[in-house]
């Protein structure tokens, strides 16, 4: 489906004369994985929060599946960098809470089967009755991912979900996420600062620019470029740097980020 998510001329301004970004427009197709990259302050998280219904734009519109986004919805699952688990509930109970919200008519046995299926998808069945305080950082993020998938959202929104994890744990969960996305054909919008992570996971990469003074005039930030990822979709981390075109793609994105950093 073309244009499952549509962003039209989105802008956000905390000060009227200096919008953080302006005139941001893009589409995401159903089943597509799109990453957004840019320096801090360019508005990446603001855009994600607008898509999640947690913030409003100063102008412009965001549509998903033909309907304008006007507030939070269980049609969109969100995973933040911080795990956002309820500390007094177990893994099972944290996910069951979300499942009950989506399907209030379900009975406990049906909820448990559904929860266990999604906990198993992220390899945490042995820890299903533990509380967050008993889990490592990587395990908590796995729970967050399982919870997001468990409500079967039309779209998954990820705000640097692996940013606080060590490299080994991050790589393992990236692999798990890729497997689940392929299995479910999930539509994903993800913020990352990691160029290799974006190349590994995404079908397209959105490059954001920051607002800046140019010849004494303020120019808002915005969507500077949309980069198509030409690498085969069934790629793995180990294969990544062997693919023709990998270094050209990586260098292009790094050059963009370096040039924008110098502009500041």
Give each language-model segment a name.
Residues 37-39:
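The feature captures the beta-strand-to-loop junction immediately N-terminal to the Walker
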Residues 185-191:
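Conserved H-loop
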Residues 108-127, 179:
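Conserved ABC ATPase "signature" region
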Residues 60-71:
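Conserved ABC transporter NBD signature motif
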Residues 89-98:
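Short coil-to-helix segment of the ABC ATPase nucleotide-binding domain corresponding to the Q-loop/switch region
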Residues 52:
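Helix-to-loop junction immediately C-terminal to a conserved catalytic motif
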């Amino acid at each position: 489906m073309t244009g499952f998510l549509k962003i039209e001329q989105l802008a956000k301004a905390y000060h009227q004369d200096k919008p953080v970004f302006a005139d941001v427009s893009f589409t995401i197709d159903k089943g597509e994985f799109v990453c957004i990259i840019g320096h801090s302050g360019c508005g990446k998280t603001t855009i994600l929060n607008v898509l999640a219904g947690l913030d409003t734009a100063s102008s412009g519109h965001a549509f998903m599946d033909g309907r304008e986004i006007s507030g939070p919805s269980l049609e969109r699952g969100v995973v933040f960098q911080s795990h956002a688990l309820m500390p007094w509930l177990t893994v099972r109970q944290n996910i069951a809470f979300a499942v009950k919200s989506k399907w209030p008519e379900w009975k406990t046995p049906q909820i448990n089967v559904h929860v266990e299926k999604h906990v198993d998808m992220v390899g945490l069945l042995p820890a299903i009755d533990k509380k967050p305080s008993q889990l490592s950082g990587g395990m908590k993020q796995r729970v967050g991912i399982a919870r997001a998938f468990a409500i079967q959202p039309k779209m998954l929104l990820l705000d640097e979900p692996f940013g606080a994890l060590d490299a080994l744990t991050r790589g393992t969960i990236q692999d798990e996420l890729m497997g689940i996305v392929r299995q479910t054909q999930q539509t994903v919008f993800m913020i990352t600062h990691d160029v290799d992570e974006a190349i590994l996971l995404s079908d397209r990469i959105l490059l954001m620019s920051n607002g800046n003074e140019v010849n004494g005039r303020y120019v808002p930030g915005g969507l500077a470029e949309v980069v198509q990822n030409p690498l085969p979709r069934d790629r793995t981390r180990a294969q990544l740097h062997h693919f023709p075109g990998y270094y050209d793609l990586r260098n292009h994105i790094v050059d963009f980020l370096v040039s924008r950093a110098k502009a500041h």
